[in-house]
C-alpha cells in the first residue's frame, strides 16, 4: 500500500513543481526556489530524519503543544508512535527531500522546448494554461513516460534508510516492508539467513523486471512511447 501511494503522489509532484516554476515564476525567483528545494536532497536521511523526529516528538512537537493549549486538541497526539501517521510522515518527508532533485530532469526538458512555440502561441492569444497544456506537457511527454516506466518498475524499492529512521516498535505494523524485512532477516537475525534473503531479493528483482516490461508495453499501446 505504501509503495503504490508513494508512486501516486511522489511521481506527479516533481512534474507539477517543474512546470509551475518554469511557467509561473520569474527567472530570478525561479533560481532561488530551485536552490532551496534542491538543498535537502544532499542531507543524509539520518540528519534530515532527525530534524523531523525532533519536530514531531511527543514532548517537543510545537504544533502539537500549540493546538493542545488552544483547546483544539483534547490531548497531545503521539505522531511518531501512532501507526496511522507513519505513511503520511514517509510521503511528506520524501517529497520535501526529493521533489527539487526529482524535478531537475523535467526542468531541463522544459528548457529545451523551442521558445518560438511559446511566442507563436502568444500571438495566437494563448494564455499560460493553454501553453502548458498544448506545448509544455506534450513536449516533455517522452520524459514523463520514461520516468513513469522506471518508477513503476522500482515500486518495490522504498528506501530502507528512510524507513529505518522513522521506524519504531509502535508503528511497526505500518512501517515493515519488504526492504526492511530483508535487511533485518539477513543481518540482524541470529542465524544470518543470507541464502533466504538473497532468494527474496532475487524474486523482488524478477517482479521489478516484469513490471518494467508490462509498464513499457502499456505505455507504448496508450501513448506510442516507451523505453524500447
Protein language model annotation of sequence segments:
Residues 1-228:
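A structural signal for multi-pass alpha-helical bundles of membrane permease subunits
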Amino acid at each position: 500500500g505504501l509503495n503504490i501511494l508513494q508512486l501516486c503522489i511522489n511521481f506527479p509532484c516533481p512534474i507539477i513543481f517543474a512546470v509551475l516554476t518554469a511557467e509561473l515564476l520569474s527567472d530570478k525567483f525561479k533560481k532561488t526556489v530551485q536552490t532551496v528545494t534542491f538543498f535537502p536532497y544532499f542531507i543524509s536521511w539520518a540528519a534530515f530524519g532527525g530534524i523531523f523526529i525532533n519536530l514531531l516528538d511527543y514532548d517537543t512537537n510545537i504544533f502539537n503543544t500549540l493546538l493542545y493549549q488552544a483547546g483544539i486538541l483534547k490531548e497531545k497526539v503521539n505522531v511518531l508512535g501512532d501507526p496511522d501517521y507513519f505513511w503520511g510522515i514517509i510521503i511528506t518527508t520524501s517529497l520535501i527531500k526529493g521533489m527539487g532533485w526529482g524535478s531537475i530532469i523535467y526542468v531541463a526538458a522544459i528548457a529545451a522546448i523551442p521558445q518560438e512555440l511559446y511566442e507563436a502561441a502568444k500571438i495566437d492569444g494563448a494564455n499560460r494554461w493553454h501553453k502548458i497544456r498544448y506545448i509544455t506537457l506534450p513536449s516533455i511527454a517522452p520524459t514523463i513516460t520514461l520516468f513513469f516506466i522506471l518508477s513503476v518498475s522500482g515500486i518495490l524499492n522504498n528506501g530502507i534508510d528512510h524507513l529505518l529512521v522513522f521506524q519504531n516498535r509502535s508503528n511497526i505494523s505500518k512501517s515493515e516492508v519488504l526492504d526492511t524485512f530483508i535487511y533485518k532477516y539477513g543481518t540482524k537475525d541470529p542465524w544470518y539467513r543470507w541464502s533466504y534473503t538473497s532468494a527474496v531479493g532475487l524474486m523482488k528483482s524478477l517482479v521489478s523486471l516484469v513490471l518494467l516490461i508490462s509498464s513499457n508495453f502499456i505505455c507504448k499501446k496508450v501513448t506510442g512511447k516507451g523505453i524500447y
